[in-house]
């Protein structure tokens, strides 16, 4: 019986890529800098303190690939010689450092074209597009239309939105258009329908914005605004066939998507999508789906909180806390991996919480492989995340993917 479990620790980069200078990210190192701040006692909030303690991830080879990736030692990390997994680290060949690019490349469909972006920090979405959306969606207008972080935009426009019911539109250096609306006053269903309509408008005009993101929030005063777990991403469809589509098409297999995975691939190559938000719920859902998984199944999960709650908000303590929680609970998952099963833990980009700004960082990612029948081996540097997709294709005896080289 062949089952694969693909876990993405969203934004868990391990050092700048060779082209990081193009992004202003030379020196970025999500894992390394979190470890450094913990070592310096600069990450002692949320009830955690001191050195970063993640022994189970280290037992899969994390420290070894992190040092190889960055060329620097890890402060406060005591590595182990008792490595039970195999390991590698990978460069990204996609043009961007965004969620869609990283995930599509993992699945064997790197983004070698340029996304469209709303690069102007003010009046970001052009007037003609705003008018299109307003007319077709029967709106009175938008608030914002600028570059902003999710928390800042609510501080600035949340109360005005409540009184006017005008959606809040904002973007960033990523290929995204984000729409924030109050979950009850504007309505969750109405927000989703608005984002679907924007997706259709952009697609019709051949505007390659990767994701339209619905960002519902609650609260009635600035100090009480909170984004909820009901975020939805309305993505473009992958431009190339993914390994998940091959598994379904060639083996009549199943792909169980947990959390935001289905949204990232616009539902393509997904058999079943399991709704879950928050680190604990995502982990528990993953455990349950692994227990239920049959032959020729991929269980695919993204742990988004590392990125959305801690990376973008530049919160080192929160990132460290959740890494330690994940590591503490990882043995529960490892014991469910049968002899023929394949577990891969990786990331889609970096988001160094010690870095300037609030955006992703262009970084290499770890590829931690656990298979009971495999002896521990260092598979070294990989040129593309698509080596993961090619490895899965070989594992399931599928036809060869267009990109990537099987890791083993």
From Swiss-Prot:
Leading EC class: isomerase
Cell compartments where the protein resides: Cytoplasm
Keyword vocabulary terms for this entry: Cytoplasm, Isomerase, Manganese, Metal-binding
GO cellular component term of the entry, any: cytosol
NCBIfam families xref list: deoB (TIGR01696), PRK05362.1 (NF003766)
Classification via PANTHER family: PHOSPHOPENTOMUTASE
Name of protein: Phosphopentomutase
């Amino acid at each position: 019986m062949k089952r694969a479990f693909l876990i993405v620790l969203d934004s868990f980069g391990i050092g700048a890529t060779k082209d990081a200078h193009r992004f202003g990210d030379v020196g970025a190192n999500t894992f390394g800098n979190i470890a450094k701040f913990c070592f310096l006692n600069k990450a002692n909030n949320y009830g955690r303190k001191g050195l970063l303690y993640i022994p189970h991830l280290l037992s899969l080879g994390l420290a070894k690939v992190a040092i190889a990736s960055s060329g620097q030692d890890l402060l406060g990390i005591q590595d182990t010689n008792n490595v039970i997994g195999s390991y590698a680290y990978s460069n990204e060949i996609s043009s961007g450092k965004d969620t869609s690019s990283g995930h599509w490349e993992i699945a064997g469909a790197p983004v070698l074209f340029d996304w469209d972006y709303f690069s102007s920090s003010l009046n970001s979405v052009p007037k003609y597009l705003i008018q299109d959306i307003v007319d077709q969606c029967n709106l009175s207008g938008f608030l914002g239309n600028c570059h902003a972080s999710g928390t800042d935009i609510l501080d600035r426009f949340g109360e005005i939105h409540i009184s006017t019911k005008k959606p809040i539109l904002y973007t960033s250096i990523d290929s995204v258009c984000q729409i924030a609306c109050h979950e009850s006053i504007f309505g969750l269903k109405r927000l989703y329908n608005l984002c679907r309509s924007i997706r259709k408008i952009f697609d019709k005009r051949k505007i390659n914005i990767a994701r339209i993101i619905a960002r519902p929030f609650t609260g009635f005063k600035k100090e009480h605004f909170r984004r909820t777990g009901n975020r939805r991403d309305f993505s473009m469809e992958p431009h190339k066939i993914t390994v998940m589509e091959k598994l379904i098409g060639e083996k009549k297999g199943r792909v169980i998507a947990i959390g935001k995975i289905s949204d990232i691939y616009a539902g393509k190559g997904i058999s079943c999508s399991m709704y879950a938000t928050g680190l604990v719920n995502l982990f528990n859902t993953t455990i349950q789906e692994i227990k239920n998984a049959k032959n020729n199944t991929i269980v695919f999960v993204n742990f988004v909180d590392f990125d959305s709650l801690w990376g973008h908000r530049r919160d080192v303590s929160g990132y460290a806390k959740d890494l330690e929680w994940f590591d503490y609970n990882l043995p529960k998952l490892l014991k469910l991996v049968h002899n023929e099963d394949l577990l891969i833990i990786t990331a889609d980009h970096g988001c160094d919480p010690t870095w300037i700004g609030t955006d992703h960082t262009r970084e290499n990612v770890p590829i931690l492989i656990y298979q009971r029948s495999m002896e521990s081996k260092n598979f070294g540097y990989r040129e593309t995340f698509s080596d993961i997709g090619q490895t899965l294709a070989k594992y399931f005896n599928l036809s060869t993917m267009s990109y990537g080289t099987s890791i083993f």
